[in-house]
C-alpha cells in the first residue's frame, strides 16, 4: 500500500531539508513553533527521533542518554528488522509492483523482561510513506519500552504533565477519548501488567505522531503509516493496532482443528464509529464510483486526499478532520491451544483469507521460512487472482507460541522439518490452482480484458464482517480470474520477469491524490518542486 495515483515522485536524498514551500502557512508556522520550543530534535536523516516527555529526552533501558540511534538498535541482541528469523519468530517482506517498498517490520525479543517480545508491522503510504514506516519502526518500540519500564516502577500520576496529560490525542481531534482505544473481553481478568502497558501505548503513539509532525526532514503532510504491534509477556498478550494492517492467531478448536482468530479490526472509514468521528470533525467519508467498496476520508471542501483508513501516523492534512493516531488496544490470555500469531500488511489480506494464511504458515517446511512462505503465496495469489493489477508490498511477522514444549523438543522438530524435501501446499492454495487449471483454461483473451480489475477488495469488509474478532468457520471461495497460468508457472517465474500486471492498473490505494488547496490558501508551488 502507499501508491499515489496523482504523483510519481522520486524520493529525495535524505528526505530533503525543511518543510516544503508548498505547505500551507498555518502548517509551517505550527511546525516551526514546535521546533523552537524544543519539542523535537532531528535524528540526522537516518537516525531515531529524540523527543521526550515534557521536553526531556527519553532514556532507553540500556542506560544511555536519549533514544537509540540506528547503530545502537542494530547492536541490540534479539532485535531483527530485516528478512530473517529469531529464536521465537520469523519475518519477511517483499516489494510489490507499485514502486518503493513502503512496508517495515521488527521483532524484539527480551523486550522488557526475559520472557517478553515485541513484534510490529508498519505499512507506509503517500509520497514518503517508506520514510515514515521506517521511522516508526525504529522509534515506537523504544518509546513503548521506555514508558513501560518507567510506569511499572512509579505511580501513574507522577508521569502526568503538560505534554501527555488530558486526552490521548486532544491536539489532533477534540473527540478522542479512551473509548477509541481499548476493547477487551469482559470475562478476561486483566493482569497487573496491562494497565501500565496500555498507558505506555497511548503515550508512545501520541509522542510518535507529534515527532513526525515536527520533524524537519520527513514530510508527513500527505504521507503516513499504519502500525499493528504486539507485546507478549509470558502468557499475556497485548495488541495495539492503528490502521488497516492485521493480526491473526492460529489456534486449535475443541476438535483439535487449526482455526484462525482475528485479533484486530481493520480500522477503515466504513466502520460506523470511525465514520461518525470523522464527520463530527467536518471530514467527509465516501467511496468513488469505480471502487464502491472502498470508503475513503476526504477534506471538507476538497476531493483529496482520499485516505483508505481511519487511523494512521502522519497524514497531517487530515488530522484536523477526524483522522487520529490513537491505537486500539486489546488483551488476550494465551492458552496451550494457541500456536502462532501472524502480523501482516494489507498486501497479504487483499488476496488471502485469515484461514488461508494460517494454513500456509502451518504447512511451511520450517519456522524460519514460514513468513517467506506466506509472502510468496500472497504474491502468487496476486498474479492468479488479479493478473491485470500491480501487486502490493507484503510484510509478514510470524510469532510462534510455545507453552508446553521444551526447547530440546522444539529444536528437534525444526531439524526434522528442515530436512523435508517436499514443501506441503495448503489445500486453499491448491484449490485455487485446481480451479484455474480445470475451469478457466477455456476463457478467451477478449473475456479476460473485459473482466473488471477493481471488482473486489479483500481488505475492506462490511460492518458485519469486520466487527467480530473471530472469523466465521466457513471460508469464502476464492474468486476466479481470467488467467490460465498454473501455480507451478507462478512459482517458477523469476522476480525480475516483466509480467502483465506491470502494465495493469493499481488496485486499492491508500492515498488517491494530494490536496492542492487547504483552508482557502493556495499552495505556492507544486508538490513536485522540492530542493
UniProtKB/Swiss-Prot annotation:
Keywords per UniProt: Hydrolase, Magnesium, Manganese, Metal-binding, Protein phosphatase
SUPFAM superfamilies per the UniProt record, alphabetical: PP2C-like
Record GO biological process: regulation of intracellular signal transduction
UniProt cross-references to CDD domains, sorted A to Z: PP2Cc
Cofactor: how bound: Binds 2 magnesium or manganese ions per subunit.
Domain PPM-type phosphatase: 88-401
SMART domains, sorted: PP2Cc
Enzyme Commission designation: 3.1.3.16
Listed cofactors: Mg(2+); Mn(2+)
Segments of skewed composition (Low complexity): 10-25
Entry's Gene Ontology molecular function annotations: metal ion binding; protein serine/threonine phosphatase activity
Keyword presence, Metal-binding: yes
Top EC category: hydrolase
PROSITE patterns, alphabetized: PPM_2 (PS51746)
Positions contributing to Mn(2+) 1 binding: 123-124
Residues reported to bind Mn(2+) 2: 123, 346, 392
Pfam families found in the cross-reference section: PP2C
Keyword ATP-binding applies: no
Residue spans of biased composition, Polar residues class: 151-172
Reaction catalyzed: O-phospho-L-seryl-[protein] + H2O = L-seryl-[protein] + phosphate; O-phospho-L-threonyl-[protein] + H2O = L-threonyl-[protein] + phosphate
Domain of life: Eukaryota
Disordered: region residues: 1-47, 151-176
Protein family according to the UniProt entry: Belongs to the PP2C family.
Name this polypeptide is given: Probable protein phosphatase 2C 66
